[in-house]
Regions:
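Conserved beta-alpha-beta core of the PfkB/ribokinase-like small-molecule kinase fold
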Residues: 64-130, 146-147
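Conserved phosphate-binding/catalytic region of the ribokinase-like
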Residues: 99-103, 126-230
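Conserved N-terminal subdomain of the carbohydrate kinase-like
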Residues: 1-63, 221-230
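Structural motif corresponding to alpha-helix initiation and N-cap regions
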Residues: 24, 49-55, 73, 97-99, ...
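Short, hinge-like loop/turn segments at secondary-structure boundaries
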Residues: 4-8, 31-34, 85, 107-111, ...
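A residue-level structural signature of the nucleotidyltransferase/glycosyltransferase Rossmann-like core
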Residues: 44, 110, 138-140
């Protein structure tokens, strides 16, 4: 895993080996172009407050921090609080699905659940549009084949449809979308520009098998965007 990260230009300086604990794994079963994922946390469960404190000096130099629920929720919330106190933007992808406290929702810059995760977090009392309008340019909801939606501060609900794709495997599509969205936001794109880029990247990822192996390069995404624009 680390070798693959390094081969793709990802800094792995702070990836640590935990003695006697296996690497976390996700077993993905694919059928009818969809997937079921079984997660064994392994060493991911060892990412605690002490580890965060040990890398705090480095963490506070970052332009953006991206989190998921793949590590203990206590650690996630600890990092959110730390970043909020130091005015560092945080993107929280609440997967695997779990409740998100109201104060954490307020402190993150972006919250990016899928439809099912959004129901768990906010309940079933409001429509997707009502939820988005309650959290403009904070809440981003992915909706599978129906694309991704958010609300702008102007009050407009922005729906970005999916790019047509020959779907082979949806594993990692959400991770791809989140990564691409954060990349483009960090590069200065508008919300709409970043979402169109991210949705295209996610669509391309579904045309290959594997969560990591299916992720497209920036060049592939740019090519697809140019082709779509004619």
């Amino acid at each position: 895993m680390v070798e693959n990260m390094l081969a793709n230009g990802v800094n792995a300086d702070f990836v640590r080996t935990v003695e006697g604990v296996p690497t976390g794994i996700a077993i993905v079963t694919v059928g009818e172009n969809d997937n079921t994922i079984i997660v064994v946390a392994g060493a991911n469960a060892e990412v605690d407050r002490a580890y965060v404190d040990s890398v705090k000096e480095e963490l506070l130099t970052y332009d953006m921090v991206v989190l998921q629920h793949e590590i203990p929720l206590d650690t996630v919330h600890y990092i959110v609080d730390l970043c909020f106190e130091n005015q560092i933007p945080v993107v929280l992808n609440p997967a695997p699905a779990a409740e998100v406290p109201a104060d954490i929702i307020e402190k993150v810059t972006w919250l990016t659940p899928n439809e099912h995760e959004a129901v768990l977090i906010f309940g079933e009392g409001k429509t997707t549009e009502e939820l988005l309008l309650a959290y403009p340019e904070k809440l981003l909801i992915t909706q599978g084949s129906r694309g991704v939606s958010t609300a702008l501060r102007s009050g407009q609900v922005l729906n970005v449809p999916v790019r047509p794709a020959k779907v082979a495997d949806t594993s990692g599509a959400g991770d791809t979308l989140n990564g691409a969205f954060c990349y483009r936001i960090a590069m200065g794109d508008s919300v709409e520009e970043a979402l169109r880029y991210a949705n295209t990247a996610a669509s391309l990822s579904t045309e290959k098998f594997g969560a990591q192996g299916g992720m497209p390069t920036a060049a592939e995404v740019e090519k697809a965007l140019k082709e779509a624009a004619g």
